[in-house]
UniProtKB/Swiss-Prot annotation:
A motif (Bipartite nuclear localization signal) lies at residues 198-216. This is Nucleoprotein. It is found in: Virion; Host nucleus. The keyword Ribonucleoprotein applies. One of its GO terms (cellular component) is host cell. Its main location: virion. One of its GO terms (biological process) is symbiont entry into host cell. Late in virus-infected cells, may be cleaved from a 56-kDa protein to a 53-kDa protein by a cellular caspase. This cleavage might be a marker for the onset of apoptosis in infected cells or have a specific function in virus host interaction. Homomultimerizes to form the nucleocapsid. May bind host exportin-1/XPO1. Binds to viral genomic RNA. Protein-RNA contacts are mediated by a combination of electrostatic interactions between positively charged residues and the phosphate backbone and planar interactions between aromatic side chains and bases. A motif (Unconventional nuclear localization signal) lies at residues 1-18. GO terms for molecular function: RNA binding; structural molecule activity.
Amino acid sequence: MASQGTKRSYEQMETGGERQNATEIRASVGRMVSGIGRFYIQMCTELKLSDYEGRLIQNSITIERMVLSAFDERRNRYLEEHPSAGKDPKKTGGPIYRRRDGKWVRELILYDKEEIRRIWRQANNGEDATAGLTHLMIWHSNLNDATYQRTRALVRTGMDPRMCSLMQGSTLPRRSGAAGAAVKGVGTMVMELIRMIKRGINDRNFWRGENGRRTRIAYERMCNILKGKFQTAAQRAMMDQVRESRNPGNAEIEDLIFLARSALILRGSVAHKSCLPACVYGLAVASGYDFEREGYSLVGIDPFRLLQNSQVFSLIRPNENPAHKSQLVWMACHSAAFEDLRVSSFIRGTRVVPRGQLSTRGVQIASNENMEAMDSNTLELRSRYWAIRTRSGGNTNQQKASAGQISVQPTFSVQRNLPFERATIMAAFTGNTEGRTSDMRTEIIRMMESARPEDVSFQGRGVFELSDEKATNPIVPSFDMNNEGSYFFGDNAEEYDN
């Protein structure tokens, strides 16, 4: 990325800061996570949760969702204007699980949103601390990415289930700001744009009038975000075409789907951050760790360190495998849903298996599930090594167009070969190279055909021992060539939309 100098690092986006040096960034990210930790401790006090109950990931998620809901201004306004039966627009709540007489019981709690906002601001030195809220949203998004496959959403917008590795961040709310935009995959952006264009086709007032002007600005902004994720001139030029279209319609949808397919080989740059559940930050703050003084980074050793020393529990349904539940949460914590399983397994130090082989459902428990037989287990979230999170798509040669890993959007900056069947992907590109974008399409197809699967990505980059916090001795793993590890393929994960 030649423009690196003008971009804010994603920690800066995360903390809403202007350009800062590394120490300032570490301090402001530290301030953000310690605010989350302080808020969590206060909520546990309010709810009178025992130490064990406070470490339960399901309780953490409920508390996180309450604060996100308390600050969701647009939805709050909507709820006040459209009162629905049995929903108090001023309250928020959810299930809290408590240990009673050797059993887990579910208790539904209800709080004033105003009160939650007060506690949150108090924990964040009186500020709204939007960065911390976004951080929680990204953790929820990463958990969804690891838990559900968005096949149905892909098919609905005319894309194809093989593109699921482009769908990072597909459940992030629109209000997630620059930090949210940075972690969205190419497919997610394409899907948002296609939905918008389809609305414009069906509703002739969509682009008109004062509202239409705002819609248009949002459309162009989304196009620019997507353009910024592409790393080749031809892909970017095609995005300019889509953005400048007078009246976006089916031609633009075609172009966007073409671009999404091309991103399977010419990968876009998508940021990865390790966002942990609030209870983990709470535990660290409670034990006296000073995040702001020590500094914190979402893309370095810090989250690995934190998870080495945190004990988090989870409710387990009767026929679930606790080790599999741990894998799911580990992947979510490191935003590794679309990473090569060979790389994840090496870093984690235990085999990471594909989604279809996991005997575990999602982490959250539906309100109609029976609590009688529920058990709880410690989640194993430790790792053998740590590695730096990347935002490059893992293309082998950043200057020229080159191959990234198909069906994988790399999370860790670790050298790997690219085992891929180019023929299967190229088959999707037969046919249409007519129209205004024909020369760009031809150029993109040419680049894809010249991509060589023998190359390696992240040449020379390795993992580090957990004692090596300055990242001085990279250990470059060697992987079995023919065995690419995509998490979702050949798979029957449940759908997010259910």
